[in-house]
Amino acid sequence: MEQALGRVPALQTAGVKMLTNGPESFTPDGNFILGEAPELKNFYVRAGFNAYGIAAGGGAGMALAEWVANAGPPYDLWAVDIRRFGRPHFDTDWVRARTYKAYGKHYTMAWARRRA
């Protein structure tokens, strides 16, 4: 906080007195996880937003609410559907390596023809 006050003196009189940094959750493919857990009926997941939680939260919440109410996704949500991960993805080493890679690319420039 002291460093922030040094850079922006106006913060001394602002209402901000404490900064809080929360943990982020990233997924192996960089897409968030949404939908009913395949192994647990009526248990819905909305997680792993890869730092897009605020930006995607409203739409993801609406989509999941419709999913719960209508017993299925309201439109094609396969890119974020929890079912896209299966037994082959249970390998902890693979998940860790892919998640680190997704995190590392999160803020990079999205160039055309760049390999994933």
Regions inferred by a protein language model and the residue ranges of each:
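C-terminal catalytic lobe of FAD-dependent flavoproteins
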Residues: M1-A102, T108-R114
